[in-house]
């Protein structure tokens, strides 16, 4: 079998084009060119299997190294026939991201497997294979066909169209005898009903033309893979967002588990939803207390939290007395209105220990487990060792361990060896993770079978006391803390405590750390949310000595020199502008009758009415330590005030170049800004606005484009970005270029001139929602600010008269319907907001429905749905209402 590749691509001097066949580890097929633009090359491929799609990609090479390759997870395709002496001539265009790349994702394409053998018949006179890319068809409801101006293509008769075959998701092909065609050939693609085969729509394109390729005997001409679009086929989907821990079923053990996901998927399918979104599910076990309930502080980017295991799938416990005790405990915990994190985890861990003793050896000896271990050993072994050592030494802080503070693979391999004295304790973690893996895999496959997009969540950070920080410290900056500048969630900014990434080191191996993480996630999910996508442009890095986020700076960034600061007309005074400004008036105003105590304890007199921090309390961490055992309201007020003293500066020194500076974020609200005269304020504001909103756009664009194209194309999952907060102009540039779905929330409009977003103006390539886990629910928000609610009721909903203090069901239904009607591709609403439309089943206590309060770093994540999934599935009235709303808004 001979292959000829032809492509037009303009190269620079010294560059050449090559072709790599996927799955073929041989050297690239280097093409020839007469002019640096038209390239052609041949290869003999006698061993290619018949009737099986063959994929290949083009790349640009210089000095034998590939310097650029085609974008995306999509390759060129053709399907060889059974005849071995054929000559395939492929005519191609270079493939960058297709116009609707998100529709080619596994979220919409699924894991396609052809149900029949692909038929490719090559005629003696030569054949033409028409190739088309079409992501717009409704999966399993429509097929692609071709119609044209000759008898072989039906002479434009819609009853005689020629059906094509889908050889890969969205990739359609048909091979016709060249002698049956008439040239020049005019043709178009059409969408047909999969059952009746009747034409439902013609493609939105002029007639396509094909001249006679003048083929020789045995030659098969492959047309370029052209994109096909239809006007009326814009997909729109509705879905539900809910954490796994919040699920409740009749058989769950006080917390949602992976088994409950299948019931959630059943309910979603029953109500014509096509998406289910969850929060991160990785192991966060650090202290074995409720503090570990925060799902974004994982100790492993691969291991799942043991509390999500469905104990019912482990088999029957032989010890009947123990089983009875566990069943009583299960019923007790499952009856609680919220999660008792510590009780649930202790009980489920004890249950797992019993089952490990009963079935562990058999499971670990199975072929299925051995395959799992072989494929996951690179993370599973260090995770198990870390978990064992964490409990052995009573701390997750590996720098405090008496042994193994520095990860050495040989030592850890010996610790985890089957002949090790602690092997059984290590193997317990293998056993647990194996069952979690097969249960989540089962849930993910079930979602695919049901046509449900299964959307996961990629946290931006990791715990500084984590497996990855232990075994791969070179990937992280451990001397800083990741967070976010002040926003609607927190006036002092957010300090997540995560180490920041060492992107320079990650770039050296093409971001393999991230690519492996995404590929692992793709085993289970078909879509994912990039938590805080802004972190791939720049991260808000807070000094390790800070508690609040106000003293942070963007990394990477372009700090300002003293000369540049002064060029704005602002005379630079280092001590006044970079050290905490504290005077008598400020102390009295902030602390009132406690000002004397603050003077005696935390500050000391400098000169005139000016004070400075005492050395023993000159950082927020030192102050935090002083108040560690003081929890009364007055102490907390003083502590927060002293924090504010320390952050009362106009400029923050750059972390690497201390003679250069960053304007302190949101300083216009602090005392020091009030000390400036009007000219200085004007100069500072001009400097500030340029620095935060203009200076870095190109710089951060380039930073993001180093990383995100590689990461988003590492898998076929649908990519959604959480682009909230302080969003620079370059973020939508990158998201548009890479076709990443944005997040649209009406109460957090992207247009700063609007109080509320206009849902009808949302971009198609977006996810719209009413509230996220970091926000109050729809009903909770309605009750927060009555004046704002009135404006929304009048100006957005168009209603007048008395505004209800609490949102009645009809108000919630109207708001939900407006969101379903918006142009967004995905409308994924929180479970609580779906329930808000029905006053009979929604939970009476609005406040308990909130999942997280970002301003509180010690928030207890314990929300749980108040009714069971079984009850939800049986609620005919509510479910029929959802079906009506979803169907009439075109989302099914």
Where are the predicted features?
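Extracellular carbohydrate recognition and processing domains
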Residues: 97
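Catalytic cores of glycan-processing enzymes that make or break glycosidic bonds
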Residues: 100-123, 127-129, 177, 211-892
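Short amphipathic alpha-helical leader/targeting segments
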Residues: 50-51, 72, 78, 160, ...
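C2-type phospholipid-binding modules
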Residues: 77, 81, 85-93
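Glycine-rich, flexible loop segments associated with nucleotide phosphate handling
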Residues: 52-54, 811
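Aromatic-rich carbohydrate-binding modules that target alpha-glucans
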Residues: 2-52, 61-82, 133-183, 192-215, ...
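Intrinsically disordered, low-complexity regions enriched in Ser/Pro/Gly/Gln/His and often acidic
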Residues: 31-33, 87, 163-165, 195, ...
